[in-house]
């Protein structure tokens, strides 16, 4: 994190340099978890600690003199993996932290399809998607509160998204192929030949269900 010290973000959305921002996000993430009545998880705290680790590497300045950090979530996830692997941390922890970092800055809306697609991106072998989705909201909330006060309004939207995501999960709305009411065997029985087309059709079906164009 040394390059982040005194690194001016040159943005109206940030009241602090990169290092101070990271410190505040880390502190807020832990304190708000305790306020919610739970101990902050290791994955949340590591993600808060490393979420902007690649900002100095991605810094650009536009014609108006404003700073931008395009690609820092993706590069940050890669750098975090290297750091955490070097520390011999568990595979599951590294995987979850990298997912949180990769998507911490992704624009989201409190809409069904948007949140189901986010869960789809977070899902994978061994991933506890409901927990990780909630931690993504925790990270976004802490990240927002570590910016300029003019950004704080977004916390209300984050809580709207959290509530809707929990409703979707409780209702069993599908966000993975395994959650579809049909599978590859069903397609084969109606004449689809085994091969890549099966996966393409199932993914198209999941797209349609997520967009609420067809029922599951």
Regions found by a protein language model. Name each.
Residues 21, 93, 194-197:
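Helical mechanochemical/support elements of P-loop NTPase systems and associated helical scaffolds
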Residues 2-7, 97-99, 197-208:
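Short linear loop/turn motifs
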């Amino acid at each position: 994190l040394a390059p982040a010290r005194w690194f001016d973000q040159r943005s109206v959305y940030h009241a602090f340099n990169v290092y101070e921002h990271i410190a505040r996000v880390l502190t807020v993430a832990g304190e708000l978890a305790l306020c919610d009545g739970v101990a902050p998880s290791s994955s949340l705290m590591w993600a808060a600690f490393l979420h902007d680790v690649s900002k100095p590497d991605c810094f650009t300045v536009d014609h108006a003199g404003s700073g931008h950090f395009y690609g820092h979530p993706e590069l940050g996830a890669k750098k975090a993996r290297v750091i955490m692997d070097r520390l011999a941390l568990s595979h599951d922890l590294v995987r979850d932290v990298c997912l949180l970092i990769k998507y911490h800055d992704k624009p989201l809306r409190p809409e069904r399809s948007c949140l189901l697609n986010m869960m789809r991106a977070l899902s994978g072998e061994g991933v506890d998607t409901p927990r990780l989705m909630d931690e993504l909201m925790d990270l976004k909330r802490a990240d927002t509160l570590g910016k300029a006060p003019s950004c704080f309004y977004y916390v209300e939207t984050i809580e709207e998204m959290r509530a809707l995501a929990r409703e979707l999960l409780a209702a069993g709305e599908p966000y993975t192929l395994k959650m579809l009411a049909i599978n590859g065997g069903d397609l084969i029985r109606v004449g689809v030949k085994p091969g890549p087309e099966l996966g393409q059709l199932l993914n198209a079906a999941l797209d349609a269900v997520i967009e609420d164009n067809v029922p599951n």
